[in-house]
Amino acid sequence: MIRYRLLRERLQQCGLFQPDDFEVPPAASEQQLQLVHTADWVRRVLAGELTGDEIRRIGFPWSLQMVERCRRSTGATVAASRAALRDAVAVNLAGGTHHAFPDRGAGYCVFNDVAVAARRDRKSVV
């Protein structure tokens, strides 16, 4: 999405970050997504088997690019959470997709990246 590129460019123009400060996030694995989401929801999102009503609830059409973006946004939140635990600070410019439910998306959110990261951190810290 163009807004993420524009945000990154603006942060660099302001001198807050250098190009080397940014990393390409890993895509969240199916296993990570299933820490919060049902196996059926994850499978159907990845396979493009969503109903018209589910797509309308999310707010944008299904595409391979959408799936990749959602997986990487979630992976970035997981990575940022790990980095924050290790280094006391981290940023994910694309995170915050917290409207998704375990078995469905909503409000422009397919996966709940915040919940996935919290579950992952809880499993690794406890």
Give the residues covered by each predicted segment:
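HDAC/HDAC-like amidohydrolase catalytic core signature
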Residues: 1-124
